[in-house]
Amino acid sequence: MAAMQWCGAMTRRIMMTQRTSAALNCSARYSSLSPACAAPAVSEMDLCGRGDKKTKKGKRFKGSYGNSRGKKQKMIERIKDKLELPRSTPWPLPFKLI
């Protein structure tokens, strides 16, 4: 658990230094109202978590379904396809088939 917290803190620290250095470079080259300056900061904000629509947590937050958060019935069908069983086989699978 401590390792995960340490890695998260390191990642945040790295991202903050990159964001500040990008902002300094951008403000030195362009005016502060330029949309070219705002674009890198916006893209770095959606890394992971609730705001990321590609993760399971993000899909729960948005209320949508997809490959990373599939519905139960679709998951069962994918398992049956892996086992090469007809989809009409009842779930849970009989013990002899497992």
Curated annotation (Swiss-Prot):
Keywords carried by this UniProt record: Mitochondrion, Ribonucleoprotein, Ribosomal protein, Transit peptide
Instruction: Kindly list the places in or outside the cell where this protein is found, as annotated in its UniProt entry.
Output: Mitochondrion
Taken from the record, one Pfam family name reads RPS31
Give the stretch annotated as transit peptide in the record, renumbered to this chain. 1-35
The reply on keyword Glycosyltransferase is: no
Compositionally biased spans, kind Basic residues: 53-62
Renumbered residue ranges of the record's region Disordered: 52-71
Q: Which GO terms describe its cellular component?
A: mitochondrion; ribonucleoprotein complex; ribosome
What is the first-listed, main subcellular location in coarse terms?
mitochondrion
Source superkingdom: Eukaryota
Subunit note: Component of the mitochondrial ribosome small subunit.
Family as reported in the entry's similarity comment: Belongs to the bacterial ribosomal protein bTHX family.
Protein's recorded name = Small ribosomal subunit protein bTHXm
